[in-house]
Swiss-Prot record:
Pfam families: GATase (PF00117), GMP_synt_C (PF00958), NAD_synthase (PF02540). Pathway: Purine metabolism; GMP biosynthesis; GMP from XMP (L-Gln route): step 1/1. It catalyses: XMP + L-glutamine + ATP + H2O = GMP + L-glutamate + AMP + diphosphate + 2 H(+). Catalyzes the synthesis of GMP from XMP. CDD domains: GATase1_GMP_Synthase (cd01742), GMP_synthase_C (cd01997). Coiled coil: none annotated. Homodimer. GO terms for molecular function: ATP binding; GMP synthase activity. It is an enzyme of class 6 (ligase). Its EC number is 6.3.5.2. The active site is at residues 84, 175, 177. This is GMP synthase [glutamine-hydrolyzing]. It comes from Wolbachia sp. subsp. Drosophila simulans (strain wRi).
Length: 520
């Protein structure tokens, strides 16, 4: 089976490279930058990710793996693709000058294609201007010997893409793995062709591989699982159950922070124990306003409850979680070099000395892959295609302190928002939609009286993997916008007229980046 090694230097987008490669039917693995060369020496090609460092700083460990990969390339012509910091590392190795950019570039920009190359075959035409995503403070200032400039920045004349065709080394300052880059996936596909990769990796093969891994790790021991009714925990539970059957014990904990009338979607043949701990969670959140502290309290309490329930079951050694890769990336656990954006319920806030070992069968899958997996193992569309819901629940959608009254207000708003969205046939067009209760009150008028109520923010985004997202709607189609505008006016009116305590509704139009999808 063909395989690509992705060397992770700490980019927030590294996992998107893997998602793109796997989506093209090629197996790939992600390795930290301190990986031993023996581990990666047999791969068909190498992709060097971006990262937050500068090649002008001390990076001896980083340089080691790059030097070894380039030496392998010299001996075997194994293809290399360097992205952003990866480009800078390659250029630095060959003696080119990399310096801090006169004007740093973060976000969408345009590049101009200057020459043809196999890496841009059927991707972009020569002399065309292309939208790409840049995310760099440093840039390449001189061209290494043997390399040719294929593209440059339209505004800043950044060296955007260089190649050494003889050595099969390709470098981009921009990020082809991120959707704002037009046709970036085709560039990656061209690299896989250059590396002679067969497109033979499938979700079915991943499922069989994970089942075997779960069996080998767990053996004959019992596993306790957190299930919330959401996509991730449901798919993880179903996959684990297929691997070990009755050894899996699923528990649904009511934290008091769920959607109104939220119930666990039926998972056939998997028994589920229900535990109400809403008073415990709400009491521990009293007086807490910092979002990270909320997450850690919820994470600690969650594990504490599971440990208590595990004792009741007896002889439990493992805790299964529905952690997916976007959780890991945003928490800074994918690489030692990755900056933490925010901790996630499934990967942050865990006690340092946890009495249960972790089983995370979805840890290296993105949301769209999780849905494909769920479909493959026979879960219903009701489970698979529901919108994501955060592990900490409404606690991270109530800005500032959480209490029972605020939870009830937000539950009412959320129910109206989602149900009205479904009535407008918009729900399935949107990746994630939710309401946020803000920590401010504003003056309003209802009837002949003055009101002083909460402001509620509505959010709806489109995405495929949760790593980047656009506010919905993102297309300038008049009819599309008119329908959504009518929906917003209608749902805002319904909310303020039916939810006591709320007198103003606003809509969040921010994309990711620079914002995250959730507010906290």
């Amino acid at each position: 089976m063909s395989a690509i090694a992705i060397i992770d230097f700490g980019s927030q987008f590294t996992q998107l490279i893997a998602r793109q490669v796997r989506g093209m039917g090629v197996y790939c693995e992600i390795f930290p930058s301190n990986i031993s060369f023996e581990t990666i020496s047999k791969f068909n090609g190498f992709i060097l990710s971006g990262g937050p460092q500068s090649v002008n700083d001390d990076c001896s460990e980083t340089s080691r793996v790059v030097h070894e990969i380039i030496k392998l390339n010299e001996a075997t012509s194994v293809p290399i693709l360097g992205i952003c910091y990866g480009q800078q590392l390659i250029c630095h190795y060959f003696g080119a000058k990399v310096k801090e950019s006169f004007k740093q570039e973060f976000g969408r920009t345009k590049i101009k294609i200057l020459k043809e190359s196999p890496i841009v075959k059927d991707t972009w035409d020569v002399n065309s201007e292309v939208d790409v995503l840049m995310n760099h403070a440093d840039s390449v200032d001189t061209i290494p010997q043997g390399f040719t400039v294929i593209a440059s920045g339209v505004i800043n004349q950044t060296i955007a893409m260089i190649v050494n065709e003889q050595r099969k080394i390709y470098c981009t300052q921009f990020h082809p793995e991120v959707k704002p880059t037009t046709n970036g996936s085709k560039l990656l596909s061209n690299f896989l062709d250059i590396a002679n990769c067969k497109r033979d990796w499938t979700m079915k093969s991943f499922i069989e591989e994970q089942k075997e891994k779960i069996k080998n790790v767990v053996g004959e021991k019992k596993v306790i699982a957190a299930v919330s009714g959401g996509v991730d925990s449901s798919v993880a539970a179903a996959l684990t159950h297929k691997a070990i059957g009755k050894q899996l014990n699923c528990i649904f904990i009511d934290t008091g922070l769920l959607r109104k009338n939220q119930t666990i979607a039926m998972l056939k043949e998997i028994p589920i124990n229900y535990v109400d701990k809403s008073n415990l969670f709400l009491s521990r959140l009293k007086g807490i306003t910092d979002p990270e502290e909320k997450r850690k309290i919820i994470g600690n309490t969650f594990i504490e409850v599971f440990e208590e329930e595990a004792k009741k079951i007896g002889d439990v050694d493992f805790l299964m979680q529905g952690t997916i890769y976007s959780d890991v990336v945003e928490s800074g656990h994918a690489s030692d070099n990755t900056s933490t954006i925010k901790s996630h319920h499934n990967v942050g806030g865990l006690p340092e000395k946890m009495n249960l070992k972790l089983v995370e069968p979805l840890r290296y899958l993105f949301k769209d892959e999780v849905r494909l997996l769920g479909k493959e193992i026979g879960l219903s569309d009701e489970i698979i295609f529901q919108h994501p819901f955060p592990g900490p629940g409404l606690a991270v959608r109530i800005i500032s302190e959480v209490d029972k009254e605020k939870v009830q207000i937000l539950q009412e708003v959320d129910e109206i928002y989602i149900n009205t969205m479904k009535n407008y046939d918009l729900y399935d067009k949107i990746w994630q939609a939710f309401a946020v209760l803000l920590p401010i009150k504003t003056v309003g008028v209802m009837g002949d009286g003055r009101t002083y109520g909460y402001v509620c923010a509505l959010r709806a985004v489109t995405s495929s993997d949760g790593m980047t997202a656009d506010a919905f709607p993102f297309e300038d189609k008049d009819q599309h916008l008119l329908v959504f505008w009518d929906f917003l006016r209608n749902v805002g009116s319904i909310i303020v007229n039916n939810v006591p305590g709320v007198n103003r509704v606003v809509y969040d139009i921010t994309s990711k980046p620079p914002a995250t999808i959730e507010w906290e």
